[in-house]
Amino acid sequence: MDRIRKGYESRFRALLQQANARLLEAGVRWLIAKAHCLSERDGISLATALTEIYERLASQPYFRKSNLRSAPTLFFCDAGLGGLSRWLRAAGHDALWRADIDDDDLLREAREKSATILTTDSMLMERRLLRDGVIAALWLPPTLRIRQQLNLVFREFGLKVGEPRCMACGGELVTQDKEAIRERIPPKTYRWLDEYFACSRCGKLFWRGTHWERISKQLHAAAI
């Protein structure tokens, strides 16, 4: 629970910073205390109370105007968010991810590439580079499932579903001549589909079959 509380401290701090609050840390402490009171009064978990307080604050007209962040050109997902990185790519947003990356390398590479970090690690959010806003970052509650993570990222940055990228590496997809790649297409698929794409980075072949239709529906649902 302490990690979740720290994570929400970072979210409250970012929200208040964007609203140019003067007594920043006092404001964060007051919001945490308010969540504790709500938890005790309504008999709900502190995590639920923190979420409710944040959503209430973020939905206020003043904060809605100041809270929307500019859409990043590149995300960098921490080691535990491989699934989220794939879904962001499918939605047309470039997202880096490496399973074996440590925190120091994550910070260094994100700064070099001007990437926005996505993390479930509240302790990482305590790093000075993130606290001071040198590197843009968003903390995601670790209790969220992948679709909920995606929905939160979409809401925080006002993202839209764009042209899909390679879900494996994030490369742009380039239209291919069907006959030129015939040997790479499964025979049954070749007979009923004419449009194919290859990743400009890794060369992986894609087509919009029934699997993609399901993915597309879920992406648009997350964007609502």
List the model feature ranges, each with a label.
Residues 9-51:
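Helix-enriched interaction subdomains in cytosolic or periplasmic regions
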Residues 39, 43, 47-69, 214-217, ...:
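SAM-dependent methyltransferases
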Residues 132-224:
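Cys/His-clustered metal-coordination modules, chiefly Zn-binding fingers
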